[in-house]
């Protein structure tokens, strides 16, 4: 049974599919935070065109956020998973084994991130919303001038009879 997480944002909705088999600890953290409402009303604090959109920090600064395991937890790097294109769901970190609640979604291939960030899913639907986010006007610190935020995140259990 796959786990999907649906996001309603100020720019539209999108759904991500989690790679539970490849990054079980990361997926459990992400799904649990979403289920608890942790991501509700959190802004996308960093958007870089042709690179990625980043969110998951309840302080909105890019320096906050914690995991369900405490402050930070270890990477789950899978050599078979790569940042090969747009729509890759990956953990943001400030170095090895430093994962909390922040995550990003790629807007294009980012091979230099391979082996440095845990890939734990992909955008399943609503990629156009993510692409539109990547085009918003930002300031010199890559923060959107007009706020882009997650209104609500929720778990969508897939039964397999799609």
Swiss-Prot record:
Gene3D superfamilies in UniProt: Cyclophilin-like (2.40.100.10)
Molecular function via GO: peptidyl-prolyl cis-trans isomerase activity
Swiss-Prot/TrEMBL catalytic activity: [protein]-peptidylproline (omega=180) = [protein]-peptidylproline (omega=0)
Keywords, in A-Z order: Isomerase, Rotamase
InterPro entries assigned: Cyclophilin-like_dom_sf, Cyclophilin-type_PPIase, Cyclophilin-type_PPIase_CS, Cyclophilin-type_PPIase_dom, Cyclophilin_A-like
Occurrences of domain PPIase cyclophilin-type (ranges): 1-155
Enzyme Commission (EC) number: 5.2.1.8
Keyword Nucleotide-binding included in the entry's annotation: no
A Pfam family per the record: Pro_isomerase
GO cellular component: catalytic step 2 spliceosome
GO BP term, pick one: protein folding
Biological function: PPIases accelerate the folding of proteins. It catalyzes the cis-trans isomerization of proline imidic peptide bonds in oligopeptides.
Similarity annotation: Belongs to the cyclophilin-type PPIase family. PPIL1 subfamily.
Entry protein name: Peptidyl-prolyl cis-trans isomerase-like 1
